[in-house]
Amino acid sequence: MAQPKGKYMAYREFGLEPSVTYVEACRRLRAAFIADGAYERPAKPTGQMRDNASRGNFVVLGEDGIKRGRAVREHWDKMRHAEEAARVKLPTRAERSGYRCRADTIAAINFCLGKGEDLPGWRRKQRWELSNIRKLLEPENERLRAARPSPQHVRRIAGEVNLALLCALVDALDWPDVQLPYKFAAGFESVGEIPDSHVYRTIEPTMDEEAFAELRASVDATNDAWLTEVCSLMKRRAKQARPADVEAMRVLKEKSDAEAANGLCSGPITLNQLRRKYTRQGKLAARVQPRFAAWQGRAGARKVRAIDDGLMSRTNEITRTRETIVTPSPEFPAHVVDELARACVARGIPIPDVELGLDDLFAAYRRVPTAHPEYMIAAVWDLETAQPVFYEVYGHCFGLVSSVLNFNRVPHLLCVAAAMLFAAPVDHFFDDYLTMDLAAGCGSAQACLDALHNAVRLRLEPRKRKHSAAVHRKSWALSATSRTWLPIAWYCSPPRRSESRTS
């Protein structure tokens, strides 16, 4: 549910009343938006494709009001079977994937069509307005920082985040996740009860509060024994490691050291240092996450992804959530083209060519600060010392249930803000952004998405940017989005990925 208009709830989370300057900044943001409307929280889809009797993707409601299944059963007469199949209307793209473009995406598409060749110039003016609003809010940013001083680990990764502009975006959009800016000052709950952001699809917890509290207490009571078990496990794995496993351990240590050098986590500490720092009244008040390496790609282009085992550590078990994320379909560009074609038919105009830009949010989960640093400790085996070492992650470990929810709240807000401010049809798959644009936009939608991230100081990764173009190759797909006189987008695996699947 959206926050009540004009309540400035994100700002008030800091315990302050909005100033005249802040109210004016929100007013200017609202005036700059291309449309008005409350965000609709995703709901659980009803029916499944196999439900052919009364609901599901293969059931249609006829003009006579009778529901009929679209699935065609086998028939002894093959010609009759073929004739029946030819008359069946296949599910639409939205019905197949369960994904539909959000209202802000559709508004952006229609606005782009209205602007046409003037789109790049209009977006330049919008960027200028955002820049002016950001400058107007700088004193407010200092005021918010003073009202809620951040813990040291939060300051290290989120000390530069523009809290005032995040608040203004949330309040101007009437965005339901009113606590998001505050969490960048205080840290996000990562263990235990994870507050509902009101952005994603609701789910019912599987355990009541009393039983959950007992479970968490019982797990926390084993912290010391668990640390000993992790050390033994890592020593045993190192002793039994094959050459490929040894190489993975080496790369894993290098990646962890690189994150420490980039200020995303502490440098490695020893077992004794860990115990001294986190022992409270004779008990260990920390739960470590064993970090392991997952190889990705083929020989010659393989890389290691560091994964922290929240399942083995039981950290995920003591995490209680009330919502689950809803990711976009991999066919997002095709969904946008479908909406574009529909809008063009309604206007009676030709369908223009489109382009796709790809971006990546730098450091992803590591940029979202945790409120539970004692649970964000990754254990890594050091081949040189033949001992385990530990890294204190300031953000979120990769492998925790809470990491997924807390991180995705950030790009989700910024996608909607980009659509409303810049008419940029954009969605994200975790930390990967897919930005659609008219060819007439000359890549300005992607440039505006970048400008928005720079303004809130959660910057994108320039090295991973794929500039707006009609054809893109990425590790998981190749898409062609030009020639939209036919509303089609093609997706296929790159040759290297295809070879690995068939080998």
Regions found by a protein language model. Name each.
Residues A244-E247, V251-S256, A260-V401, L405, ...:
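Catalytic-core region of right-hand nucleic acid polymerases
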Residues A107-I325:
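Reverse-transcribing Pol proteins
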Residues P290, R302-R305, I351-G357, A424-D427, ...:
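Beta-sheet entry/capping signal
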Residues M1-E160:
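Intrinsically disordered, low-structural-confidence terminal and linker regions
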Residues L358-F362, Y394-G399, L421-A440, H472-S479:
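Catalytic palm active-site di-aspartate
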Residues G263-Q273, A424, R459-R465:
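Short secondary-structure junctions
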Residues V404-H453:
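Active-site palm subdomain of RNA-directed nucleic acid polymerases
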Residues Q387-Y394, D450-S503:
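A conserved non-catalytic segment of reverse transcriptases
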